[in-house]
Each structure stands twice: as C-alpha cells, then as structure tokens.
C-alpha cells in the first residue's frame, strides 16, 4: 500500500460521480456471476450454508450465480483480479488486498446474528491444557505447536499477529512448530490435540455449535481481541452499473422475510448494511502498525534504513489519521443536519 492508495480511499469507496452524472448508455449486463467464498471452513461445510442464499440471489437478479471456492484466501483474491470472481465474501484483510490489487470495491457489510457490530479474534487451546491465559502461552511458547491462520485472514493472522506477537515483541516463529490453516482446520486440530494452540474467531466457534458440537466442547478460549468490523462484501469495480444496482438492491433488502432470516442465521448473520472501502481504514492502520514493529525489530537493517522505512510508514499512518478525522467531522455534521 502507498500514499496514493490512501489518498484515493475516500473517493474509491463511493460510487463514481462521473458515472452518476454521465448520460445513460447501453451496457452489456453480465449473464452469470461467480460468488467467491473464502475458505474459513471445508467446502463440504460451506456449500450447504451458502447454497440457499445464492439461489435466492439468482432468482432476484435473474442470472446464474455460481459459488466459487478456493483452497485459500489468495485464490479468491486472484480470481477477482483476473475477472473470474465477480462478488466475494472476504475478511477485512483479504478485502483490503482485493481493493488494492484486484479492482475490488466494498459495498456491503455483514452483521452478526445477535446484532454485534463485528466479531473477535481468539486463541484457543484444548480444554485439558494447563495454559489458561496469554501470559501462560508466551512463557511456554518455545515448547508449543501453533496453528496460525491463513496469511490473508484478519482474525486468524493479522489481528493476533499485532496484538499477541508484535505488541509483545515476539514472533510466530518462536514456537516449537508453526503451521498455517483455516479456522475450521485449526479448531479441529486443537480439539484433537494435534496442535497446542491456534487462532480462530467467535463467528467460526459459533458455527461449530452446529457442524461439530462435540469438538467445540474440547476447546478453551485463552485470549480475545478487540472488536473486528463485520466482514465486507466486495464486487469488481468493472461490473456493469446495471448489475451493481441489482446486487446492491438485493443485499440491502435481503433478510426481511422469515425464510430469508433463516438463511442468514445459518450463515451466522442478520440483514446486511451498506458499507464502503472506508471500513478498511482501521485494518490498514493495524497492518501498518504491525509493519512498523517489524521494521524496528529487524536486526538486518541499519539505522538509516530503519529511519527511512519508519518515516514512510508514519506518513501513511498520518494520512489515515487525517482521513479518520475528516470522516468523524462529516459524520458530526450529518447528525447535526438530521
């Protein structure tokens, strides 16, 4: 990410003004859409959860909607980059990558079924483990095996990477052995005592109540992060405006009937709310904070190089702070007008 990307956030997060003001013109509407689904669980579990939702979307839009699965988050990002994925459910970190590298744009946000404004990253151990808190974990880490998340996962990688590791000046490589996997795989590995500790999140643990209740009973949460914003729904910017309008209308109105509410509840959600690329600002700040920590602790860099890199990162953080201040001011004015 660079300063140009940050500077353009406030504009790219909204619909193109030039598009809104330009004369109407004929567009070729997409005849089918591929919906990317990140691999938080096995495809076997995800497919029945998502099929009713995608079928409803297909009926509303009047075009075929195909589920697009990949073995990791990067597969969905790359799919969008090469126009193989049209819409996708991402975590915040993978959405940031899609926006920056794959011509993506956030337009909606998930809301937890209980109405929570987001979810939490957690560290889990087996219920029989003597480890009960973060201090226990840090003290014994060199003797433990660690199940880290997908490198593009917000709750499985970025958030614990900052709050657990960077803030305590340690690394995931400090463990006896570290492996990377999705949330479901990590949870089952801890339940089966194949790894000692792993990352996860509260949404996925809730899903285990249905998909693997006996395994859930084997888990113990030893750390919980600050709140993470709800997951973004992202489309390709170069979709036709006609298709975007239909997609947006579907998401903003879905979940009003008992049948639709039941479909969303199976996914762990309540009705969606509107969003934009601006919801990624806190995640951008977190990624930059983590990068700053890494530069400062890098023994391979001389002091001059460290200063240059940290100065560049700080400039990006300052840009994001100014953007946040502007958004807060705009929000205050909007509330005053109302």
From Swiss-Prot:
Principal location class: periplasm
The record ties this protein, via SUPFAM superfamilies, to: Periplasmic binding protein-like II
What keywords tag this UniProt record?
Periplasm, Phosphonate transport, Signal, Transport
Report any one BP term from Gene Ontology: organic phosphonate transport
Q: Which Pfam families match?
A: Phosphonate-bd (PF12974)
Q: Name one GO cellular component term.
A: periplasmic space
Signal sequence coordinates: 1-26
Q: Where in the cell is it found?
A: Periplasm
Superkingdom, according to UniProt?
Answer: Bacteria
Keyword Aminoacyl-tRNA synthetase in the entry? The reply is: no
Q: Which InterPro entries match?
A: PhnD, Phosphnate-bd
The entry's function note states:
Phosphonate binding protein that is part of the phosphonate uptake system. Exhibits high affinity for 2-aminoethylphosphonate, and somewhat less affinity to ethylphosphonate, methylphosphonate, phosphonoacetate and phenylphosphonate.
**Subunit annotation:** The complex is composed of two ATP-binding proteins (PhnC), two transmembrane proteins (PhnE) and a solute-binding protein (PhnD).
Sequence similarity: Belongs to the phosphate/phosphite/phosphonate binding protein family.
One further remark on this entry is: The sequence shown is that of strain K12.
Name the chain's protein: Phosphonates-binding periplasmic protein
Q: Which organism is it from?
A: Escherichia coli (strain K12)
